[in-house]
Amino acid sequence: MKLVLKADRLIDGSSSKVIPNAAVVIEGETISKVCSQSELTEIELAEARVIDSSGGTLMPGFIEMHSHIHCSAESDAYTHITTETNETFLLRGSQAVRSSLSSGVTTMRDLGSRNEVVFPLRQSIEEGIIPGPRLLVAGTPITTTGGHCNTFGTEADSSEQVVRAIRNQFKLGADHIKIMSTGGGFTPGTNVRAPQYDWTTLRDAVKDAERLGLKMAAHCHATEGVRNCVKAGIHNLVHCSWLSENPEELYDYDPEVADQIAEKGIYVDPTLALSHLNKLRGRVKTPDSGAMADPERRFEILRDMWHRGVKFVTGMDSGMTNAHFDDFAYIPEVMVNSMGISPMEAITCATKTSSECLGRDNEIGTITPGKSADVLIINGDPSVKIEALHNVDTIVARGTVIKESGQLLI
């Protein structure tokens, strides 16, 4: 049976225009028609299941670009990671993907979880055993010996070892590769202000990942780490915090490198919402506390990058302390209210731009005939008030109705 979604307006993800009185027709797992409600035929309506949302907005499903689905998102998340069993991680992961889907995330990229967890979970979602978003996985992140996330990462120091680690993840079925190019605040004893790999090692990693058809995302806080990643041709920078090697200087923003990021088409996931949520939830020291020690300066840097043409994508770092799996809507909210871009620009980052970063823009990211039927109906108008994204009324993921008129069906 066909499915017809009707709402007061539509944001298709590819245009800055809002289309009034819109309808989306879905057949199986695919969008077959996008039109005004007046263009729907009597036969289409008679043969279809119709969901009509007065006051609502049709838009593409959210794309969460940065998650760790085996992590707890609780205040003692690091303790959980270092003490729990793979069986517990699987249970946490199954809850995480369900929670994400229930909040409107229809595509989710995991950027570092145990191989024994993410690959079985991806298969379970694909086979319909458990509900979840389309799950794209890196498996274990690649890090140096004792480096950031070493407790669940693959430790590799030389170019040869890093390339071997990439090939192993490819053999297991990874959708992309994650490498820790600098230290991180979540892992005790690592240095967020210093690189873990030189640019030649990263270059060799990128070259082999590209040979295998895989894109590479790099965790980077230190400015020197950012420089190394850009020089090496990393596809996606995660955090991109521009931290100075001198703690007293805090940031060491390099506009020339920002221009190179824009020119090379490198996507940036600034994980903006994590510190915002820590502040809301009363935690002062955060995994990225160094990156947001001066939030106004951080947002000033990001605004400058935006104006230079850098493309931003939407990652929560969900699973890390206080970053819950149903928190996605805070990302575009912070992009609008703190970074200063428009609601429509933030929505495009969360849909179309993120799909392009994944190399899946022929399949997801916009409401276009022929693409996957990943469609939300928002109660309200997020093009005017971005906070409306918290009010997801209806969710369709790959043609299946997950939530209808506020009622969760999974």
Residue map of PLM features:
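Histidine-rich, glycine-flanked metal-binding segment
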Residues: 2-4, 10-59, 80
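C-terminal cap of metal-dependent C-N hydrolases
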Residues: 8, 12, 350-352, 356, ...
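Metal-associated gating/positioning segment near the N- to mid-region
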Residues: 56-127, 221, 225, 232
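Active-site mouth loops of central-metabolism enzymes
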Residues: 78-91, 147-164, 215-220
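Divalent metal-dependent hydrolysis catalytic cores, especially in the metallo-beta-lactamase
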Residues: 92-118, 132-143, 174-187, 214-215, ...
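Active-site gating/metal-coordination segments in enzymes
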Residues: 146-203, 238, 242
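Active-site core of metal-dependent hydrolases
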Residues: 187-297, 313, 318-320, 340, ...
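His/Asp/Glu-enriched, well-ordered alpha-helical/loop segment
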Residues: 211, 286, 295-381
